[in-house]
């Protein structure tokens, strides 16, 4: 008998893309496409139950076992370092975690660098590797504003197209990490539901390589 697998999907644009991949991989759940406010959807026949959660909460659901597997951005995984298995790069939601500064800013070497970010741990790790003294300014939004109004010297943030940076006269001066969506698993679930989770992973992997092949043509 197949055991039911609980999947935490990130709400929003990325989550819809992720669900489409699960569907193409053979784990469809038609009710998820209906326009309703429900958060939990299941397909008993396929042994799968999906729920929508805030993207930054996916790792919490998976780490604590409320979900067996989930899809989380590498940025969230690096920032919170959850105790989970990372099984697969989903090859979507690709972007870069970058350092940006006002255009034409000279490099600051004679004092502590002020860095505004939503990702204090990633930022600290990055500058520790560079043995650089920094003062982290932990913001929750509109990070690009910080250097413009003199709150910080640089920012560490996610850059997709770079359009927002350009509009605010900022430029990327360094890359911290390459980010994309990852399939993660709860460690105990992986032990007790190995076959089911491996089946999902393999089906997704096949789906991803088919997609990549199609894009190459």
Predicted regions and their residues:
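Domain-level signature for soluble enzymes in the chorismate/prephenate branch of the shikimate pathway
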Residues: 1-217
């Amino acid at each position: 008998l197949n055991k039911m697998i609980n999947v935490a999907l990130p709400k929003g644009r990325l989550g819809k893309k992720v669900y489409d991949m699960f569907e193409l991989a053979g784990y469809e759940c038609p009710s998820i496409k209906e326009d309703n406010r429900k958060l939990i959807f299941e397909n008993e026949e396929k042994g799968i139950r999906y729920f929508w959660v805030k993207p930054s909460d996916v790792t919490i659901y998976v780490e604590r076992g409320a979900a067996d597997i989930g899809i989380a951005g590498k940025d969230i995984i690096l920032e919170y370092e959850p105790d989970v298995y990372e099984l697969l790069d989903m090859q979507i939601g690709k972007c870069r975690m970058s350092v940006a500064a006002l255009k034409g800013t000279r490099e600051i070497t004679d004092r502590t660098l002020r860095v505004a970010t939503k990702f204090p741990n990633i930022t600290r790790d990055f500058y520790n590797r560079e043995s650089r003294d920094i003062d982290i300014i932990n913001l929750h939004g509109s990070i690009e504003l910080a250097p413009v109004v003199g709150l910080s010297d640089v920012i560490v943030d996610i850059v997709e197209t770079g359009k927002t940076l350009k509009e605010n006269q900022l430029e990327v001066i360094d890359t911290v990490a390459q980010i994309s969506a990852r399939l993660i698993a709860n460690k105990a679930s992986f032990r007790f539901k190995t076959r089911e989770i491996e089946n999902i992973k393999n089906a997704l992997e096949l789906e991803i390589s088919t997609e990549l092949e199609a894009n190459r043509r």
